[in-house]
Amino acid sequence: MSERKLFTSESVSEGHPDKIADQISDAILDAVLSQDPDAHVAAETAVYTGSVHVFGEISTTAYVDINRVVRDTIAEIGYTNTEYGFSAETVGVHPSLVEQSPDIAQGVNEALEVRGNADQDPLDLIGAGDQGLMFGFAVDETPELMPLPISLSHKLVRRLAELRKSGEIAYLRPDAKSQVTVEYDENDQPVRVDTVVISTQHDPDATNEEIHRDVIEKVIKAVIPAQYLDDKTKFFINPTGRFVIGGPQGDSGLTGRKIIVDTYGGYARHGGGAFSGKDATKVDRSASYAARYIAKNIVAAGLAKKAEVQLAYAIGVAQPVSVRIDTFGTGTVAESKLQEAVRQIFDLRPAGIIQMLDLKRPIYRQTAAYGHMGRTDIDLPWEKLDKVEALKAAVQ
């Protein structure tokens, strides 16, 4: 009998407390960048019943009405009813933002490579905003070159939000979670979905029977291709039996607590740094996007079926301290050759990444729910496949 393996990933909806926090942080970032593209922002958010606290560091010439940004974001998510215990118009908003530390700013604004050097490359000016390691990943399991479990998990909660906002399922409330277990064959190819878990907040008068029916017919079967579902696929819909109290009324939320949901669902490694609320000088964010961009173009070029890219930086230094590529035995060329090609084609200094991916724009709020990678519903620069031909040529 051939060996088969299971792998599970989860996602959460835009109404999950941690995702509310992420979206508020990124909405503030976008509001600042729309006025001051060179701003340095590190905005953190905490949410709980009736309250939002925004704190962190911002260096900018922009004026942003934090109170309004917070309330507008909460309303867009769908928390507009006081019965939810968290409502856009009644929530207390408590901002506490200060200027970025000058000790950090001096390394970001003038990288080690240019200090005392009159003949400087302008792209050497920006040093990494912190030390750290970042990963990017791609695999040929889906058209968007993402692992199937996280791809399906995101699509399930996004479908729930669509049905809620359109009014097609009127009893749905904003908070929800999904989890998908995929069975892989001996060649690491996905063959079927073994288990689907969906927990969705609902009005108190909704019955378990109608929730179960609607979620299976209008969500699961609408999202998961029929080829992956069979009579052995298990469905767990609101397995606690009731999910009326949710969102920040049921659980507090913080920016940066869903980093695995934001990336590859645990299928690839993660350096530990969160994304939301951070401008692109923070390599936690920008280098993770660059690493995904590299990995996706490698797989799209047919140079590997699976690729993981690690980048690492020292604070205040422009050039990465390391670049590593792992193709897990699926590569068509040596990994050392791929690394040389990547160094040649991709400028991995923070300023180079910002220029390459045009990251000074206010594009981040849209990434703060349903994943930063593999998005097919929005146009993100790190998802482009414009380096495929250059990579093919470089490894000849």
Swiss-Prot record:
Protein's GO biological process: one-carbon metabolic process; S-adenosylmethionine biosynthetic process
InterPro entries referenced in this protein's UniProt entry, alphabetically: ADOMET_SYNTHASE_CS (IPR022631), S-AdoMet_synt_C (IPR022630), S-AdoMet_synt_central (IPR022629), S-AdoMet_synt_N (IPR022628), S-AdoMet_synthetase (IPR002133), S-AdoMet_synthetase_sfam (IPR022636)
Subcellular location as annotated: Cytoplasm
Residue segments, region Flexible loop: 100-110
Keyword presence, Magnesium: yes
Gene Ontology annotations for the cellular component aspect, listed alphabetically: cytoplasm
Protein's pathway: Amino-acid biosynthesis; S-adenosyl-L-methionine biosynthesis; S-adenosyl-L-methionine from L-methionine: step 1/1
Keyword list, A-Z: ATP-binding, Cytoplasm, Magnesium, Metal-binding, Nucleotide-binding, One-carbon metabolism, Potassium, Transferase
Residues that coordinate or bind ATP: H16, D175, A176, K177, R242, F243, D251, R257, K258, A274, K278
Family that this chain belongs to: Belongs to the AdoMet synthase family.
Protein name: S-adenosylmethionine synthase
GO molecular function terms listed in the Swiss-Prot or TrEMBL record: ATP binding; magnesium ion binding; methionine adenosyltransferase activity
Pfam families: S-AdoMet_synt_C, S-AdoMet_synt_M, S-AdoMet_synt_N
